[in-house]
């Protein structure tokens, strides 16, 4: 039978392992941010790219997506840009066109965002 102490130790070890994996993943994603900004600006004529959300504020986990706000991205190329970013990051991306964002989201982007 498993004791309460053993269970606590196991849960703590699993939690530490999840945090470590999340941090490794976050560092890998952060390393791709300059490339993402270059793609959006050079290939898709965006004028500004801003990181926001869990990767920007340090609350990311192993399931977090990459949240990017973009100014000047033509709506006609939005899905092409999104596909390129998902391929680059190897996972989900929330690409927000500033021109279409709700005021509450714009406020959040302004408060926590990091220009790339």
Annotate each predicted stretch with a short phrase.
Residues 1-47, 57-62, 72-116:
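Catalytic core of pol beta-like nucleotidyltransferases
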Residues 51-54:
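Glycine-rich beta-strand-to-loop/alpha-helix junction loops that act as flexible
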């Amino acid at each position: 039978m498993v004791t309460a102490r053993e269970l606590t130790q196991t849960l703590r070890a699993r939690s530490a392992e999840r945090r470590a994996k999340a941090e490794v993943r976050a560092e890998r994603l952060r390393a791709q941010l300059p490339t993402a900004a270059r793609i959006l600006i050079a290939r898709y004529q965006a004028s500004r790219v801003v990181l926001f959300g869990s990767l920007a504020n340090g609350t990311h986990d192993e399931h977090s997506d990459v949240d990017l706000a973009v100014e000047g991205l033509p709506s006609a190329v939005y899905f092409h840009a999104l596909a390129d970013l998902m391929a680059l990051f190897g996972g989900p991306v929330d690409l927000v066109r500033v021109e279409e964002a709700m005021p509450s989201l714009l406020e959040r982007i302004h408060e926590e965002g990091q220009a790339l």
